C-alpha cells in the first residue's frame, strides 16, 4: 500500500476541497487516462485495488502510471471513547482529489482504446469519485496542449536576416 516514508507532522487537519485541479489535469505519460469528475478522498487501499484490477485485465500488455499519491493522514479515535483527550491516531492515508485530476494513465504498443476503456472501467468501480475515460487524442483536440516551440538554431537566425 502507498504511504509516505516520513512526514514533517504526524497529523493533519481535514481541510476543504474547493475548486478544480490546476495541476495534474493533463495526460503526461500514456495515451489513455482516468480523470476525476468529483472531489473526494481516495485511500491507499482503493488506489491499490484499482491498480490490481487494471493490471489483471491488461496482463503484460502495457504500462500503467498512478498519478495520485496518498500523502494525507486520516486520524480516528477508538470506538466507544469519550469526547476530548486529544486527537486520534493516524489510521490510513488518502489522496485529495479535485475535479479534473488525472488518477491513472495507461499506454503501450499493445494497448488499444477498447482494452484501455475496459481496464479503466474495472478501476472505476473501486473508486469513491465519479470518473471519466479520456484519451490523448481528445485532449489534443480540446486545445489543452500547445506544441513545443522548436528551438532556433544558428542557421535559422542567419537565413532570416
UniProtKB/Swiss-Prot annotation:
- Tell me which SUPFAM superfamilies the record gives: Ribosomal protein L16p/L10e
Provide the Gene Ontology terms for cellular component.
Answer: ribonucleoprotein complex; ribosome
Region called Disordered, residue ranges: 140-161
Q: Which Gene Ontology BP annotations are present? A: translation
Which keywords does this chain's UniProt record carry? Answer: Ribonucleoprotein, Ribosomal protein, RNA-binding, rRNA-binding, tRNA-binding
Q: Which cysteines are joined by disulfide bonds?
A: none
User: What NCBIfam families does this protein's entry cite?
Assistant: rplP_bact
What protein does this entry describe? Large ribosomal subunit protein uL16
Species: Prochlorococcus marinus (strain NATL1A)
Phylogenetic classification of the source organism: Bacteria, Bacillati, Cyanobacteriota, Cyanophyceae, Synechococcales
Amino acid at each position: 500500500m502507498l504511504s509516505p516514508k516520513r512526514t514533517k507532522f504526524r497529523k493533519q487537519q481535514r481541510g476543504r476541497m474547493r475548486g478544480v485541479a490546476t495541476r495534474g489535469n493533463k495526460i503526461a505519460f500514456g495515451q489513455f487516462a482516468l480523470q476525476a469528475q468529483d472531489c473526494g478522498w481516495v485511500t491507499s487501499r482503493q488506489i491499490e485495488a484499482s491498480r490490481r484490477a487494471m493490471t489483471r485485465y491488461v496482463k503484460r500488455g502495457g504500462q500503467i502510471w498512478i498519478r495520485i499519491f496518498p500523502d494525507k493522514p486520516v486520524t480516528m479515535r477508538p470506538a466507544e471513547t469519550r469526547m476530548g483527550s486529544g486527537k486520534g491516531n493516524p489510521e490510513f492515508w488518502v489522496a485529495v482529489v479535485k475535479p479534473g485530476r488525472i488518477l491513472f494513465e495507461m499506454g503501450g504498443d499493445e494497448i488499444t482504446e477498447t482494452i484501455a476503456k475496459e481496464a479503466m472501467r474495472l478501476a472505476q468501480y473501486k473508486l469513491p469519485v465519479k470518473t471519466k475515460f479520456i484519451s490523448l487524442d481528445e485532449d489534443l483536440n480540446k486545445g489543452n496542449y500547445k506544441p513545443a516551440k522548436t528551438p532556433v538554431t544558428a542557421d535559422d537566425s542567419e537565413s532570416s536576416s
